[in-house]
Each structure stands twice: as structure tokens, then as C-alpha cells.
Amino acid sequence: MTQGQKVSVGIVGASGYGGVQLVRLLKEHPLVELAYLGGDSSAGKPYSDLYPHLGHSINLNVEAIDLEIIASRCQVVFLGLPNGLACDLAPPLLAKGCKVLDLSADYRFTSLDTYSKWYGKERQDQAIASTAVYGLPELYREDIKNASLIGCPGCYPTASLMAISPLLKQGLIVPETTIIDAKSGTSGGGRQAKINMLLAEADSSIGAYNVAGKHRHTPEIEQICGDLAGHEVRVQFTPHLMPMVRGILSTVYATLRDPNLVRDDLITIYNAFYRASPFVKILPGGVYPQTKWACGTNLCYLGIEVDPRTDRVIVMSAIDNLVKGQSGQAVQCLNLMMGWEESLALPQMCFYP
């Protein structure tokens, strides 16, 4: 695709926080025409009824999900649906010639048995699923360029894998010692009403949830860690809910194989590993990332430290869960699939303060 042709794009499941972020990014993309917004409960409503602040710029209604209409209008379709629905829509859309980017978990796993175990839905589409590419450009850039089906990563896996990938790929740590302590803002829980997301419940409080390997992002993280390490890897992953709207801070701990490695060595290694990755910012020694720095951007900030007392490396990763952790990363994949500049239309300046 040349750098001047507009591509018609549709979003199925545009009513949530990830959906409205995707609408914003695609509306501002110079090579994209937003041609379709689809949904179920919101079908028939102007999009501005859901998000009044967009009434001046988005003149589209949310339409019922109709595969024939979608395929007739759209060259590319983003699926922003709850887990378990995309796997019913993606195969017919692919058969009709659409490229598909799925923001749910349906196409993140190489093993459908793993998916079924964690997400509770039996699948028979292994042939289609096997063609999906995991949409983390910093690891699978070349595969994404040639893909028709992308399984976009989860927000926690994105932040965590960006932190640990260089260590695993180069065999610098003992993989089984990996501990991931991650904290997310409330927008990661979606737009539907939930008691624990109420201001009175979430404000001035921090708490862990889905502890001891119960979070669904655990097998996703372990799958990619295993791919990088060349063998099965188990990690200890504990997520926390923070009293903020946007952002994820993931802190990864692991034991170094070589206790003589120092912080500056690792900073050099990380800079080399991510040298072709425009959205990864390796911080200088002694500087550690904050979620506010990434707010509204597709950036991932990485801070690195070594504790010589314990021979552990500590890597901190900060992203915006709705941008690099979801919609922005999906647009990053779109840019690669279309042969465009990877960073096209993706923000790199944060909302601050």
C-alpha cells in the first residue's frame, strides 16, 4: 500500500474506552477513512450519544453488526469485542478479504487448549488461529507486516514483556525466577459499572486481585516468555488496581545469570535491543518511569536497575493502558501491515501534568 492511498477501516465494538481511543486515533490518521462503527446494545444510536464530546468530529451512527455490510465498506476491521466473540466474526471477514485486528484474547494464543482453559470457550478454528500473529511490534515486526490477522496483546502483557524481553532473548536471567508486580488504572476494567471501580471504592486505595496465577494475562505472558527463552517458562504475576484513570506500571524482578553485570551494561543491551523501536524510551541510570509520562501516548518508558546484594535485575515499564496497551498498539500494527511509517498518527507527547 503506497503512502497516499486512504484505507477504509471499521470498528466493531466501538462503545468502550478502548473503542473510543481507537476512534480518536483513526480519525486523526491521515491515511485512514473511518467507514463503519458497529455494536450491539448501542446499535442505532449516533456515536455522539455515547461520547458527546465527539459530536463535532464524528458524524457516524453505531450500526448493527452485519458482516456483509462491514466487508463491503471496510478493507481493515478492528474487533473490540468481549472475549469469545471475535473468533466467530474474524473467519468470515478474512474470507471476504478484510484484514482483521482483534483486541480481545481470542487470537493471542498458539494453543487453543490454553485459550479454552483460561477463557472457557471451546474452539474449532485452529486453522485460522494458527495464521494469527501476536501484535507486539517490538518483537514480531516482520511477521506483522505480512499478516492478515493480528491478535493484539493485553495491556499487562505489553508492559511486562517490554520490560523482560531483552533479558529472556539473550539468556541473561534465570527465567523461573521472574516476578512481575503490575499496577493499572481503573480504565483497564472497562466502561461498564462495577462496584470496585466506583470512585468511593477505588479512590485512596490500592489492592491486588487475581493473585497466585489466577489472572488471565498470566498464560499470555508465559507463552511469549517461552517463545523468547526457547522453553516453557512460568512467572509469578500479581496485578493491582490503582486509584488513577490511565496507566500501567509493571516492575519485573529476575535473577541474573552473570552477577557481574551492572546497570550500565544492561542499559546498553536494552538500547541495542530496541534500537529500531520508535516508541521505546530507555531511561538513563537512576531514572525510573512514571505512568504520567506515558499518558495519552504510544510510548513505553523503561527504567533498569541491578541489586548487587541479591544479584537481581529490576526493570520498570510504564505505558498508557489504552494506547500502547491497547488501541495505539493496534494502530501501530495497522501501520506495519499497510507498509506505512510505523509511528504514523501515533502520539508521542503526553498529557502533562
Curated annotation (Swiss-Prot):
Parts of the chain that traverse the membrane: none
Broad EC category: oxidoreductase
Entry superkingdom: Bacteria
Pathway(s) served: Amino-acid biosynthesis; L-arginine biosynthesis; N(2)-acetyl-L-ornithine from L-glutamate: step 3/4
Molecular function in Gene Ontology: N-acetyl-gamma-glutamyl-phosphate reductase activity; NAD binding; NADP+ binding
Catalytic activity, as annotated: N-acetyl-L-glutamate 5-semialdehyde + phosphate + NADP(+) = N-acetyl-L-glutamyl 5-phosphate + NADPH + H(+)
Catalytic residue list: 155
Documented EC number(s): 1.2.1.38
Record-level GO BP terms: L-arginine biosynthetic process
Keywords on record: Amino-acid biosynthesis, Arginine biosynthesis, Cytoplasm, NADP, Oxidoreductase
Purpose: Catalyzes the NADPH-dependent reduction of N-acetyl-5-glutamyl phosphate to yield N-acetyl-L-glutamate 5-semialdehyde.
HAMAP family in the record: ArgC_type1 (MF_00150)
Protein family (similarity comment): Belongs to the NAGSA dehydrogenase family. Type 1 subfamily.
Name by which UniProt lists this protein: N-acetyl-gamma-glutamyl-phosphate reductase
